[in-house]
Regions:
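Pol beta-like nucleotidyltransferase catalytic core
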Residues: 1-156, 163-182, 186-190, 195-289
Length: 289
């Protein structure tokens, strides 16, 4: 319409399937790196705390601020498997109107994946469940509500993107691998052992950056599963298995890996965030030549 040349623009985004999601072939484009600067000064004050060795009252933390089908299905399955009573969880979507819409819409949008899913009416027609503002993205970036991390043993991170496949050859070079990883993942990474309901190869990418993951808690083979439903089932199985453990059993595992949490905090803390921005700027300038 405006006779603009696409080569006059460089789109910076975290969507590794961007070229498949738009009619226009957006090329070239760059990827936003993990560890953006937003909210970092507020996170720093909560780092490097000694393990208080207290018995926590909840097993895991799972925050769900906005609607995505995989979040609805996971919460639904956690409810039917009695996993939510001993957790801090939230869903900013619910009520009878939402239930009537979602039970149809999920199968329309993702029929090939969730065709057999039946939402539990008693759970979804209830009130939305919030964690004192922890699900508001602006509040969360300014204040991670550390109390929920301090009183639970691991995080279930429900990432924004889930129904995606990332070819293995894209995860060989670090740290510029095009994966959709948001503040949800690095929030969990900073304070907890964590499992991610997100894109395949997320853990592989994080390990490539130097972070430690937690096979002591989870069967992390789920990270390599490209089939969406199979990856989902593997994540769900992990959570159900851990939920069957007592708080005392989880504490024993948690205490044994606490040094890993501190290590991840140190690595994240020591990143040169100004360099992340300057490197991205240099790549943009290089593409304009």
């Amino acid at each position: 319409k405006y006779d603009m040349d696409k080569n006059d623009f460089i789109l910076v985004d975290g969507n590794h399937n961007l070229s498949h999601n738009f009619v226009v072939d957006w090329d070239p484009y760059l990827y936003r790196p993990l560890g953006d600067k937003i909210g970092w000064e507020y996170y720093k004050k909560f780092l490097f705390q000694e393990n208080d060795n207290k018995l926590k009252t909840k097993k895991f933390l799972c925050m769900n601020g906005s609607f995505h089908p995989h979040r609805v299905v996971l919460l639904n399955d956690l409810y039917t498997n009695n996993c939510l009573e001993d957790s801090y969880y939230s869903n900013n979507f619910g009520g009878e109107k939402f239930y009537n819409w979602a039970k149809v819409q999920i199968k329309i949008d993702w029929n090939e994946i969730w065709e057999d899913v039946e939402l539990e009416k008693d759970f979804w027609i209830g009130n939305k469940k919030k964690l004192d503002g922890a699900d508001d993205i602006n509040q969360r970036l300014l204040n991670p509500h550390i109390k929920y991390f301090e009183d639970s043993y691991f995080s279930v991170v429900t990432e924004t993107w889930f129904n995606n496949k990332t070819p293995d050859d894209l995860v060989k070079e670090y740290p510029n691998t095009p994966l959709k990883i948001t503040e949800k993942t690095y929030g969990g990474l900073l304070f907890h052992p964590f499992i991610v309901l997100g894109c395949p190869y997320t853990l592989k990418y994080l390990r490539g950056l130097g972070f430690k993951t937690f096979p002591e808690f989870f069967d992390e083979s789920y990270d390599m599963i490209e089939d969406v439903r199979e990856r989902y089932e593997a994540v769900l199985e992990n959570i159900i298995r851990l939920n069957k453990k007592s708080l005392e059993e989880l504490k024993e595992i948690y205490d044994s890996v606490y040094d890993k949490i501190l290590y991840n905090q140190r690595l994240f803390h020591d990143w040169d965030r100004d360099k992340l921005v300057s490197d991205l700027y240099e790549k943009i300038m290089e593409k304009t030549k």
